[in-house]
Amino acid sequence: MADLQKIVDDLSSLTVLEAAELAKLLEEKWGVSAAAAVAVAAAPGAGGAAAPAEEKTEFTVVLASAGDKKIEVIKEVRAITGLGLKEAKDLVEGAPKPLKEGVNKEEAEKVKAQLEKAGAKVELK
């Protein structure tokens, strides 16, 4: 047990550069890749059948244009973002603009549906 505690203490004292070098050395020694482990860990959250490794997990919702119902879109933007009336109006009039960044697919699809229902054109990136 004391040996494990010493290992924990040693690892805790590493700098970021030293930790990165350690990761590279362990990858080479064990024949694994840390990047593959991340992709495998993300795949179960994607649901369904075998998802491609490059499937995105974070999306940016971009308001492409307000369409014909600008007032409805401004109301939805306020509800989604919590912005004030002037800020939401400026965002809608300045389209294309990112509305939400770094959201998961489910949240991005929900926001997109809300905005499209209000008459906006929306892109997911």
From Swiss-Prot:
One of its GO terms (biological process) is translation. InterPro entries: Ribosomal_bL12, Ribosomal_bL12_C, Ribosomal_bL12_C/ClpS-like, Ribosomal_bL12_oligo, Ribosomal_bL12_oligo_N_sf. The keyword Ribonucleoprotein applies. One of its GO terms (cellular component) is cytosolic large ribosomal subunit. The keyword Metal-binding does not apply. Two isoforms seem to exist. One is probably dimethylated on Lys-69 and monomethylated on Lys-86 while the other is probably acetylated or trimethylated on both Lys-86 and Lys-89. SUPFAM superfamilies: ClpS-like (SSF54736), Ribosomal protein L7/12, oligomerisation (N-terminal) domain (SSF48300). Keywords: Acetylation, Methylation, Ribonucleoprotein, Ribosomal protein. It comes from the Bacteria. Pfam families: Ribosomal_L12, Ribosomal_L12_N. One of its GO terms (molecular function) is mRNA binding. Homodimer. Part of the ribosomal stalk of the 50S ribosomal subunit. Forms a multimeric L10(L12)X complex, where L10 forms an elongated spine to which 2 to 4 L12 dimers bind in a sequential fashion. Binds GTP-bound translation factors. NCBIfam families: L12. Forms part of the ribosomal stalk which helps the ribosome interact with GTP-bound translation factors. Is thus essential for accurate translation. Belongs to the bacterial ribosomal protein bL12 family. PANTHER family: 39S RIBOSOMAL PROTEIN L12 (PTHR45987), LARGE RIBOSOMAL SUBUNIT PROTEIN BL12M (PTHR45987:SF4). This is Large ribosomal subunit protein bL12. The lineage of its organism: Bacteria, Pseudomonadati, Pseudomonadota, Alphaproteobacteria, Hyphomicrobiales. The gene is rplL.
